[in-house]
Amino acid sequence: MKKIKPAAGDYAPYAEQYVVLVAGDDILEALKTQLKQTATIFSARSERDGNFRYAPEKWSVKEVLGHVADTERIFAYRALRIARGDETPLAGFEQDDYVRAARFADRKLADIVEEYEDVRQSSLALFRSLDEEAWKRRGTASGKSVTVLALAYLIAGHELHHRKIIEERYFPAIPRA
């Protein structure tokens, strides 16, 4: 795969906030590095930390990580469909409904970390399998045009966005026992 960042027209305007967070132009390396970093960050936290919310209406740490894994799974599925030449417009999803239905609070943080790792390994396997043409393919997701390359960057940038929120708003606010 040629190392290049997606162009602004390769994704919806709202997605710029995620794409700009990804440093460099080697998306496979960025995804691999994130896998190690994110697993380390969350594995170091207690179950109590996993249940923490910095405000009553906000997701818990577990719910944020679960949301990151669910969103990656959806974006990778979109990338697979588009990479294989499927031109069917792909529907959006309501993130709050997914988080509510997932019941992450009923699961152990370590299990959610493991699921995140499995999802990322699966995404990496998919992206490593693609040829140049597949990376360039364009489809429609949530009513917007997107390329396979852009979806890989959205996975990485979306995770960085949420990790930043966790590190800035959640972890500093967790009361020490």
Q: Which residues are covered by each model-predicted region?
A:
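A general boundary/transition motif marking the beginning of the first structured unit of a protein
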Residues: 2-6, 19, 26-27, 67, ...
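Short amphipathic alpha-helical segments at helix-loop
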Residues: 19-23, 60, 101-108, 143-147
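Short, contiguous, helix-prone interaction/anchoring segments in small proteins
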Residues: 20-54
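Amphipathic, non-membrane alpha-helical segments in soluble helical-bundle scaffolds
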Residues: 24-32, 58, 62-65, 109-113, ...
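Short, contiguous alpha-helical
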Residues: 1-10, 15-17, 50-95, 121-124, ...
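Acidic/histidine-rich alpha-helical segments that form the ligand environment
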Residues: 30-43, 97-136
